[in-house]
């Protein structure tokens, strides 16, 4: 079986990290990148140096010419095309395209990549109409006739595996989620205009900012049994990466907190190994920086009021963990062909 050939549209936080994951994977080959807003030499700089995840150390990265990057001796074609219909993915050999601009998140817009020769598109964001898949939760529902999918959000990727384990073992009656979420690129460095979200316009590095999130409701799309049973909100906090989900649920089958811990630990060592983690050490957010798992349950941080009402805490590197799942979803789609 040959390598999985991927292209990336949008070389932002997720685009660059998906590239890092792909370039460190033996079964995946990055063949093309498109970004109309940055030059190839600047793309080299942005990829090589990363404030959060450190310098790229796995191969030399050089500029062959204005349309080609070299990772060691591996060429990657670079495009700078605004209209996704015009990106010649087929010529570059890209069969799977990661749509990571944050702009083309619905099916019709993402389908533009198919016109350029891509076979499948993975949207690295929630989508209002593309089917959403969370690896470890519902990727087995994917069928090869589906060409455009969403990898959901980083928060849904953290919450859904945890919710699945709890629901499968104890039954979730209802629940509320809060994500304490690191800063993202859409926030403001200083107070600025944000007509649709007034609080979101305040300085990211100086404030704890309440915000909305569809992550909890989206769990109902990947786990239909939980549709209408979960909702949530977000606090944006002044850290650059790593976030944490606080899930408070009422469960149907009475269980002690120890019982719940055992169920999560078993899942993390069994069917959800590599997706779900389990820790009992006294850790803080930076301890999870660079963790490739979607959801790392913090056994010491949770509490139970009684056998039916419990608060569960799970960490996630919202950049690196999510980027790994994008590539994992592509792997699954490739195997399903």
Curated annotation (Swiss-Prot):
It catalyses: D-glyceraldehyde 3-phosphate + phosphate + NAD(+) = (2R)-3-phospho-glyceroyl phosphate + NADH + H(+). GO terms for biological process: glucose metabolic process; glycolytic process; response to light stimulus. SUPFAM superfamilies: Glyceraldehyde-3-phosphate dehydrogenase-like, C-terminal domain, NAD(P)-binding Rossmann-fold domains. Pathway: Carbohydrate degradation; glycolysis; pyruvate from D-glyceraldehyde 3-phosphate: step 1/5. GO terms for molecular function: glyceraldehyde-3-phosphate dehydrogenase (NAD+) (phosphorylating) activity; NAD+ binding; NADP binding; phosphate ion binding. Keywords: Cytoplasm, Glycolysis, NAD, Oxidoreductase. This is Glyceraldehyde-3-phosphate dehydrogenase 1, cytosolic. SMART domains: Gp_dh_N (SM00846). Key enzyme in glycolysis that catalyzes the first step of the pathway by converting D-glyceraldehyde 3-phosphate (G3P) into 3-phospho-D-glyceroyl phosphate. Essential for the maintenance of cellular ATP levels and carbohydrate metabolism. Pfam families: Gp_dh_C (PF02800), Gp_dh_N (PF00044). Belongs to the glyceraldehyde-3-phosphate dehydrogenase family. The record marks 181 as: Activates thiol group during catalysis. PROSITE patterns: GAPDH. Residues 152-337 are annotated as: Catalytic. The active site is at 154 (nucleophile). Disulfide bonds: none annotated. It comes from Zea mays (Maize). It is found in: Cytoplasm. Residues 1-151 are annotated as: Binding to NAD. One of its GO terms (cellular component) is cytosol.
């Amino acid at each position: 079986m040959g390598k999985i050939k991927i292209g990336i549209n949008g070389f932002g936080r997720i685009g660059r990290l998906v590239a890092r994951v792909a370039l460190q994977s033996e079964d995946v080959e990055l063949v093309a990148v498109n970004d109309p807003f940055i030059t190839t030499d600047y793309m080299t700089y942005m990829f090589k140096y990363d404030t959060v995840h450190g310098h790229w150390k796995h191969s030399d990265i050089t500029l062959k010419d204005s349309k080609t990057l070299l990772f060691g001796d591996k060429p990657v074609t670079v495009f700078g095309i605004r209209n996704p219909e015009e990106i010649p993915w087929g010529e570059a050999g890209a069969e799977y395209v990661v749509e990571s601009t944050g702009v083309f998140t619905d099916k019709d817009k993402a389908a533009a990549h198919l016109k350029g020769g891509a076979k499948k598109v993975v949207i690295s964001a929630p989508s209002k109409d593309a089917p959403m898949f969370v690896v470890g939760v519902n990727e087995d529902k994917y069928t090869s006739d589906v060409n455009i999918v969403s990898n959901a959000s980083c928060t849904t990727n953290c919450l859904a595996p945890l919710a699945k384990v709890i629901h499968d073992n104890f039954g979730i009656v209802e629940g509320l989620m809060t994500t304490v979420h690191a800063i993202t690129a859409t926030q403001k460095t200083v107070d600025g205009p944000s007509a649709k979200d007034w609080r979101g316009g305040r300085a990211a590095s100086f404030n704890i900012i309440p915000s909305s999130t569809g992550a909890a409701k989206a769990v109902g799309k990947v786990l239909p049994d939980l549709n209408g049973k979960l909702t949530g909100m977000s606090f944006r906090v002044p850290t650059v990466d790593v976030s944490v989900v606080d899930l408070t649920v009422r469960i149907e089958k009475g269980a002690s907190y120890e019982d719940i811990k055992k169920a999560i630990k078993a899942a993390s060592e069994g069917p959800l190994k590599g997706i779900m983690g389990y820790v009992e050490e006294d850790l803080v957010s930076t301890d999870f920086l660079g963790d490739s798992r979607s959801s790392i349950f913090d056994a010491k941080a949770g509490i139970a009021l009684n056998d039916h009402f419990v608060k569960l805490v799970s960490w996630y590197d919202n950049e690196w963990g999510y980027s790994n799942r994008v590539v994992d979803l592509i792997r699954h789609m490739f195997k399903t062909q």
